[in-house]
Regions:
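Post-HEXXH active-site segment of zinc metalloproteases
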Residues: 453-474
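Catalytic Zn2+-binding segment of zinc metalloproteases
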Residues: 447-459, 483, 487
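N-terminal-proximal low-complexity accessory segments that begin disordered
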Residues: 16-80
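Contiguous, non-catalytic segments that form substrate-binding/exosite surfaces or channel walls
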Residues: 105, 109-223, 228-427, 434
């Protein structure tokens, strides 16, 4: 637990100004670590600050769950590396030790031994022999030894997992034509095959159930004595030590809830954690989505299913936040017009919602990031994921503006626009409008995109299987892109200029066709759902608009550029693709989804890829970014009563992770 301070000058300090704030913290491998401001935290009431503090503590307790979900050996490897880093007494200035430090930093970034985005395993730049020497130099009491395990046995166990490229090569495998369960290194399944998993959950599903639970969401599926068994994540079940600690902090947080509705949200989450009952999870989700009046809000639990190649099992995550009241006026305009957007979308009428319910949207300030939202974090969230809850109770959509601020501020003057944009026209638009249009596209994506459309009766929400995440992200992106160019945007005052949307169109197409390739390793295909979606959209509209030269890929001075000649026709193409992708989603057309994703979203243009990597390298830009959290401390007065919560922005990347491993490491090494 973070320490206590006696009341003094640290309390109620104003948020540092943008121009005085140091956003960049660390840089290693392909990663830059940033910090983010928490504007207006000082304006919250004491009760709200206390609520944030205790929800933050609950968030930090779940860190080890996500490590273990990503691979069963992650905790063992991380704890071994941390023991070496903290206790090695030899030469700490050698290149080998530098490489080990970088590897440990990458493990923290990926919440395990795989890259958070590409899903590929990190291969250390130091030798197995060097690693063995270091581990053997550490006192056995400092190492994560299992009962009866020697140091040599530990080394023998984890060396191939770390160093052999053929062992656990991919965290979540999405490749066509293989068993996705057996070829994925994650820890959601053990000893089972993809057909067994599909049959196991297929039997549970009732096509006539209009309010199904999210089968398999909070469990690990294993085979024991020939039988398939779910090990449930709950108090008394799998991950009980961490979940019990989360519950303990949630019980403290309840006392500071802003209102009875929020109290009900927190207590229903506690009930779910205690029982593991997915009906209680639905109850929590409904209460959460219907709490619109609380300024402080949070997500805590098994939420997103991107890490499961079959899209059923959820990773643990948490974000604690509070509403940015001024910026939320933008999203409230969007929410208020949700029915208009649904009615005027270019999709077939049978796939539209007749009545759009409960689309609530807000702009938030993140106070803490945890689990699958840390160190890498989303810039927008739309929950819950349950289709029937969204249909009957609505969804809650957020744009995380202090995170986008950190990205934007850290990117100023980095040379990217000069290197990759076609002309001063595109650069000028980006300078004037990109920050606004990027946030607006996120608003539209989260608030309207994910909330739009409907499944036809009897369609299985998991019908698209491994392609479901990509199709869903493409659907939401296209909805946002289509409406970015609608005159309604300026009519509603969401954009200040009728050409402002072109900044987002250019940025999106350039990224999808070209610049996002910096995130792909040489000779690899695209695996991550959001990247597949962006390339799918960009290449589809490029191909379909080729006759009219809507988009051109041109060479100048031996460099490749994207040129958009007709923004209005591009918008029409976005609408055509949106209609097709909504049809695929609504009807559960697996083959249609597979064809789109495999034909447009997966394969990489290799010569262009090599060029993009070289151009990025010259700019010294990190293609990925992660974050460190602020540190919150309870301030007590002379009567030992909490008088404030202070916030500090000085903790470094290494110090933060070592502290988290010391203070929030509840799980055993082997779970």
């Amino acid at each position: 637990m973070t320490g206590m301070l006696m009341a003094g000058s640290v309390a109620n300090a104003a948020t540092p100004k943008i121009e005085d704030f140091k956003y960049s913290v660390d840089k290693f491998a392909d990663i830059e670590i940033l910090r983010y401001r928490v504007p207006d935290f000082e304006t919250l009431s004491l009760k709200q600050k206390e609520l944030v503090y205790f929800l933050n503590q609950a968030a930090l307790e779940g860190r080890d769950i996500f490590y273990d979900q990503n691979n069963k050996y992650n905790l063992c490897i991380r704890r071994t590396l941390e023991a070496v880093y903290l206790n090695f007494k030899g030469d700490r200035n050698s290149s080998d030790f530098d490489h080990l430090t970088t590897y440990l930093k990458r493990v923290w970034m990926g919440n395990g031994i795989h890259h958070h985005y590409s899903q590929d395993k990190y291969i250390p730049d130091f030798s197995a022999t060097y690693f063995k020497q270091l581990v053997k130099s550490i006192a056995p009491s400092k190492l994560p030894l299992a009962k009866g395990e020697t140091v040599d046995m530990l080394i023998l166990k984890i060396t191939p997992i770390m160093f052999d490229p053929k062992v656990y090569p991919k965290r979540t495998n999405q490749s066509e034509g293989v068993d996705l369960i057996k070829t994925s290194a994650n820890n959601y399944y053990e000893g089972v095959t993809q057909p067994e998993v599909e049959a196991f959950y297929g039997k549970m599903k009732d096509p006539n159930d209009s309010t199904p639970v999210s089968y398999g969401l909070n469990s690990k599926l294993v085979k024991e004595k020939g039988l398939l068994i779910e090990k449930i994540y709950k108090v008394g079940g799998l991950y009980t030590a961490a979940i019990s600690s989360i519950v303990g902090w949630l019980e403290k947080a309840v006392k500071f809830a802003e209102n009875d509705k929020q109290k009900g949200v927190i207590t229903s989450l506690i009930d779910f954690y205690r029982t593991g009952d997915l009906k209680k999870y639905d109850d929590y989700s409904i209460r959460w989505v219907e709490d619109l009046s609380s300024q402080v809000d949070f997500v805590n639990g098994f939420t997103e299913t991107y890490g499961d190649p079959l899209g059923m099992k959820a990773s643990w995550e948490s974000i604690v936040n509070f509403k940015n009241i001024e910026a939320t006026k933008r999203t409230e305009i969007i929410s208020a017009n949700a029915q208009w957007f649904e009615d005027h979308s270019p999709v077939d009428a049978q796939f539209k919602k007749e009545t759009v319910k409960g689309v609530s949207a807000k702009v938030i300030t993140a106070a803490i990031l945890a689990g699958d939202c840390y160190p890498s974090t989303p810039i927008g969230v739309n929950l819950p994921n349950s289709n029937w809850i969204r249909h009957e109770h609505g969804s809650k959509s957020v744009t995380i503006e202090n995170i986008t601020e950190a990205y934007d501020q850290a990117s100023l003057g980095n040379g990217f626009a000069e290197e990759f944009m076609w002309s001063d026209i595109e650069r000028s638009r980006a300078k004037d409008f990109a920050s606004l249009t990027n946030n607006l596209h996120t608003d539209l994506h989260e608030c309207l995109g994910h909330g739009s459309g409907k499944l036809l009766p009897g369609v299985d929400p998991d019908a698209l299987k491994a392609y479901g995440s990509t199709i869903e992200e493409a659907r939401a992106d296209l909805f946002g892109l289509y409406y970015m160019g609608d005159p309604k945007m300026t009519e509603l005052g969401l954009l200040p200029d009728k050409d402002a949307y072109k900044a987002e169109y250019y940025s999106y197409i350039m990224n999808g066709l070209m610049t996002q390739l910096t995130r792909v390793q040489p000779d690899k295909n695209i695996e991550e759902a959001h990247m597949r979606n962006r390339q799918l959209i960009a290449y589809w509209v490029y191909e379909k608009g080729m006759t009219d030269k809507v988009i051109e890929i041109v060479k100048r001075d031996e460099k490749t550029y994207v040129v958009i000649n007709d923004y209005e026709k591009l918008r029409t193409l976005f609408g055509r693709l949106l209609a097709e992708i909504q049809r695929i989603k609504s009807t559960g057309d697996f083959e249609g989804g597979k064809t789109l994703v495999e034909n447009y979203g997966v394969k990489v243009n290799q010569p262009l890829h090599v060029e993009v990597l070289e151009r990025y390298k010259k700019l010294n830009l990190a293609p990925y970014r992660g974050f460190v959290n602020p540190v919150y401390t309870l301030v007590k007065n002379e009567k030992d009563m909490i008088s404030d919560v202070s916030i500090s922005y000085t903790e470094g990347y290494v110090d933060q992770h070592l502290r988290y491993s010391k203070d929030y490491s509840r799980l055993p090494t082997n779970n």
